[in-house]
Amino acid sequence: MNPERQETISPKNVPFQPVPTPNQQSLQSRMLESNQAVPDAFQKVAAWNHYNAVATPPIGVPQTARPPSNQSPHPNPPGYPYQSHQQQFHPLAIAFQQPFGLPQQVIYPPPPPGFTPHRVQVSPVGLLGPPGFFPQFAGSTTSQGNPSEVSVRTKSAEGTTGPIAPSITTKPTSTIQVAPPRDPVAPTTSSSGITKKPENGEFSLVKTISGHTKSVSVIKFSYCGKYLGTGSADKQIKVWNTVDMTYLQTLASHQLGINDFSWSSNSQFIASASDDTTVKIFDVISGACLRTMRGHTNYVFCCSFNPQSSLIASAGFDETVRVWDFKTGLCVKCIPAHSDPITSISYNHDGNTMATSSYDGCIRVWDAASGSCLKTLVDTDHAPVTFVCFSPNGKYLLSAQLDSSLKLWDPKKAKPLKYYNGHKNKKYCLFANMSVPLGKHIISGSEDGRILVWSIQTKQIVQILEGHTTPVLATDSHPTLNIIASGGLEPDNVIRIWRRN
């Protein structure tokens, strides 16, 4: 065994034990009833995990143990029991995290290249809405796809990635070229107007930005307001200057598409979540990848820095929440949080609690320190929840569901206070935003190519922004200025900047 490869174990006082899948549970029961020893296959799986566990050094220390990027980091060790990666269950998917006295958690590697993960758990009856409904993502046993061509977020819940017929009436009428960016695959920036003159107090399209080669899956302004980050199914995150929307940096290290990313509070780092099952930390200025965190056994769909930027929480299709130490990259907590893929995770303003949403129809609020579940929010329709975030003051939650609705929750009362309707959202996981600088508004994209702005108080639509020709997956509002950024599915994979007059 390579002496540089070491087993990395999370603290033993983590209070949560992962729930085995039905197949695993029945296997454990049969083994205990017959008083048999641990099967040889499980011993080999444990050896495989030990063989691939890598202790990553603190940020700033060279990661000499990592193999070159052009070499496979996961050669089959001697005695590896599963020679085919195309069978139904990969050993990383069936190896439960505390099998028969083994350490509570080993930081597992991602599946070997070319392997398409499969779901192994069955959802509780009735939690996914209408009978027979199930999100048809690439990670599902009912759907196959080429994950290298799209990210999970840009894939429809019905298993299609094609655009939905838009109803667009307003389109750019002029294009002004600006100076080319620095690198040879230069993103280009243009300034555009719209066909009708906007009224005072309304948003208008002021700029379009081209740079990504595939669908734009996530857009977020930095906390300082100086930068705009955009993530895509093309495996890259790009950083732009918000003053003139010129290109600054490309963050490229992931092997598959980007589903989400989070800015650190000082706007110097970005944590990213990808289909390649890893979470990475990037230095925004240099563009260097400082850390790769391995542990998730399926697509990582969402991630979030805590307000202190000392921890990163991530979640995804393995239905667990993992909390990572920013400085060391070690997993300090693993929570089996939901019974279906987790679609978003958010810390409140003080970092004491975090919220998660899932296709199981539940929103859960967690104590960030202990990992205990404080509250479970479920509405009567049980629609799959695709997004959740705390309000700026931390008192409320905003959620998005696959029933074309947004809901404002009071976590203490465990029920929705207000409903926001008017957009179309039946297939994709769309981001939504609460904007105080813009006048206490809620902003969301729509699958018909529009962006809707609601009044938080009155629930009325105050403006509809038209310009995209495909579903708008990602929106965000500037922390201090009256600016909205939006992006959507290819072929209309450009970023649009909207400003209020």
Swiss-Prot record:
Family annotation (PROSITE patterns): WD_REPEATS_1 (PS00678), WD_REPEATS_2 (PS50082), WD_REPEATS_REGION (PS50294)
Disruption phenotype: RNAi-mediated knockdown does not result in detectable defects in histone H3 'Lys-4' di- or tri-methylation in embryos or adults germ cells at 20 or 25 degrees Celsius.
GO CC terms: axon cytoplasm; cytoplasmic microtubule; kinetochore; microtubule associated complex; MLL3/4 complex; neuron projection; neuronal cell body; nuclear envelope
Start-end of Polar residues biased regions: 22-35, 167-177
Keyword set includes Transferase: no
Keywords from the UniProt entry: Repeat, WD repeat
InterPro entries membership: G-protein_beta_WD-40_rep, WD40/YVTN_repeat-like_dom_sf, WD40_repeat_CS, WD40_repeat_dom_sf, WD40_rpt
GO BP, one annotated term: germ cell development
A GO MF term: dynein complex binding
WD repeat windows: 211-241, 253-283, 295-325, 337-367, 381-410, 422-455, 467-499
Record-linked SUPFAM superfamilies: WD40 repeat-like
A family per Pfam: Beta-prop_WDR5
Chain intervals for the UniProt region annotation (Disordered): 1-35, 58-85, 155-197
Family: Belongs to the WD repeat WDR5/wds family.
Role of this protein: Not required for methylation of histone H3 'Lys-4'.
Protein name per Swiss-Prot or TrEMBL: WD repeat-containing protein wdr-5.3
Annotated organism of origin: Caenorhabditis elegans
